Swiss-Prot record:
Its EC number is 7.1.1.-. The lineage of its organism: Eukaryota, Viridiplantae, Streptophyta, Embryophyta, Anthocerotophyta. It is an enzyme of class 7 (translocase). It catalyses: a plastoquinone + NADH + (n+1) H(+)(in) = a plastoquinol + NAD(+) + n H(+)(out); a plastoquinone + NADPH + (n+1) H(+)(in) = a plastoquinol + NADP(+) + n H(+)(out). This is NAD(P)H-quinone oxidoreductase subunit 3, chloroplastic. It comes from Anthoceros angustus (Hornwort). The chain crosses the membrane at residues 7-27, 64-84, 89-109. Belongs to the complex I subunit 3 family.
Length: 120
């Protein structure tokens, strides 16, 4: 009789998960046409030539808004599972989450005082 250990299914899955993309990329490399013309290295927007330079500078305020958004988005991702299991985790987890939110509020106050949230 064939005995399967506890982790053999994992290793088989990992092997198959590695082989499928490798085989797909290999077949694509063999079958796909290769064109190395100058058009391959040009940039385009929605199928047409770009208007102006493709590399533009944007103002730092967009970066700061994106950074603040990501910080509070990550906060939401961490707080939601905690809120769903609040009864099981108890007071120590509440204190940890309070410290986590307090650190984020300090970061928000810092960004606010530096003027990162001003749109002018």
């Amino acid at each position: 009789m064939f005995l399967v250990s506890k982790y053999n299914y994992f290793w088989i899955f990992l092997l198959i998960a590695s082989l499928i993309p490798t085989i797909a990329f290999s077949i694509s490399r063999v079958i796909a046409p290769i064109s190395k013309g100058p058009e391959k290295f040009t940039s385009y927007e929605c199928g047409i030539e770009p208007m102006g330079d493709a590399w533009i500078q944007f103002q730092i305020r967009y970066y700061m808004f994106a950074l603040v958004f990501v910080i509070f988005d990550v906060e939401t991702v961490f707080l939601y599972p905690w809120a769903m299991s609040f009864k099981q985790l108890g007071i120590p987890a509440f204190i940890e989450v309070f410290i986590f939110v307090f650190i984020l509020i300090i970061g928000l106050i810092y960004a606010w005082r530096k003027g990162a949230l001003e749109w002018s």
